[in-house]
C-alpha cells in the first residue's frame, strides 16, 4: 500500500521516528497509487543514499508527485541510490526540481555503482536550476562511479532540462554520466534541454557510450543510440533487437509481442 511504501521510505531516511536502515530490502506485491500527494524521495541526499535492493516485481507506482526546491536537489521516487539494485519497477507521475544543482529522474535523481534493470518511466521530469541534469530513469551518475549498470529500461515521458547558465543536460534514459554501462534501452519521450541533449544519455567519453539503445525518430542524429520509426517500434523490429541484446546473466524481461501503451499513444515493446 501507499502507507507501507511511505514507512519503507521513512526507514531508509531515518525519518518519522524510524531507526535508519539505508540497505532495507523491499518487494512490491501490488501496484501503488500515491494519489499525487507530495512525495519525499527515498534516500534524499548522498549521505542518506539507498543502498539496498528494491524489487518491483513488475508493479507500478503511479501518481508520483515530487517537487524539490532545496539546493542541492535530488528528485525521483528515489533521490540517491548507491551500491544496490532496483529492478522490475514502473513509475508514473511528475518529478521536478527548481533548485540549483538539481538532478532528476523518474526512478532516481542520482546513482553511483547501482544496477537498475527492467524499469520504466512514464513520468514528466524537469529541472530548471543551474547545472541541471535530468533523465527518464536517472538524472546524474556520479563522476566516480565505475560499476553502474542501466539495462533493459525505457522512458516514454517528457524530459526537460533548462538552466540559465546553459548547462541543462537532458537524456531519455540518463541526464549525464561518465562511467558505467547503459544497454538495451529505448526512449520515445520528447527531450529538450539548454545544455547537452541526447535521446538516450549524455555521456562524457566515447568508450562509455550506450549500446543497443533505440529512440523514436525519422532521422539518425544521436550518436548514443539508433533512430527507429514509429512503425519499427510497433511492428516488432525494436523488440527483436532488444531480445537479441540479452546476456546470459540477465533473463529476458521483454514480452514476446509489442503492446499499445495509452500513456504514449503508441505500440511499443513492454516487459513480461
What do the predicted segments below correspond to?
Residues 1-272:
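Surface-exposed repetitive/solenoidal architectures
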Amino acid at each position: 500500500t501507499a502507507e507501507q511504501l511511505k514507512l519503507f521510505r521513512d526507514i531508509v531516511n531515518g525519518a518519522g521516528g524510524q531507526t535508519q536502515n539505508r540497505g532495507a530490502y523491499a518487494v512490491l506485491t501490488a501496484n501503488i497509487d500515491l494519489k499525487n500527494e507530495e512525495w519525499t524521495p527515498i534516500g534524499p541526499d548522498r549521505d542518506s543514499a539507498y543502498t539496498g535492493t528494491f524489487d518491483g516485481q513488475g508493479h507500478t507506482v503511479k501518481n508520483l508527485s515530487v517537487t524539490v526546491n532545496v539546493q542541492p536537489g535530488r528528485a525521483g521516487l528515489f533521490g540517491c541510490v548507491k551500491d544496490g539494485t532496483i529492478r522490475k519497477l514502473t513509475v508514473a507521475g511528475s518529478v521536478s526540481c527548481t533548485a540549483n544543482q538539481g538532478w532528476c529522474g523518474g526512478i532516481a535523481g542520482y546513482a553511483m555503482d547501482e544496477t537498475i534493470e527492467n524499469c520504466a518511466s512514464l513520468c514528466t521530469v524537469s529541472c530548471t536550476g543551474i547545472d541541471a541534469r535530468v533523465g527518464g530513469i536517472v538524472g546524474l551518475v556520479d563522476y566516480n562511479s565505475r560499476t553502474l549498470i542501466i539495462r533493459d529500461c525505457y522512458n516514454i515521458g517528457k524530459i526537460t532540462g533548462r538552466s540559465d547558465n546553459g548547462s541543462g543536460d537532458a537524456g531519455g534514459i540518463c541526464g549525464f554520466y561518465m562511467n558505467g554501462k547503459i544497454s538495451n534501452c529505448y526512449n520515445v519521450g520528447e527531450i529538450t534541454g539548454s545544455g547537452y541533449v541526447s535521446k538516450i544519455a549524455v555521456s562524457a567519453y566515447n568508450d562509455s557510450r550506450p549500446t543497443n539503445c533505440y529512440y523514436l525518430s525519422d532521422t539518425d542524429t544521436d550518436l548514443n543510440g539508433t533512430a527507429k520509426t514509429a512503425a519499427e517500434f510497433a511492428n516488432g523490429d525494436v523488440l527483436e533487437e532488444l531480445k537479441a541484446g540479452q546476456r546470459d546473466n540477465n533473463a529476458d524481461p521483454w514480452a514476446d509481442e509489442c503492446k499499445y501503451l495509452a500513456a504514449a499513444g503508441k505500440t511499443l515493446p513492454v516487459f513480461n
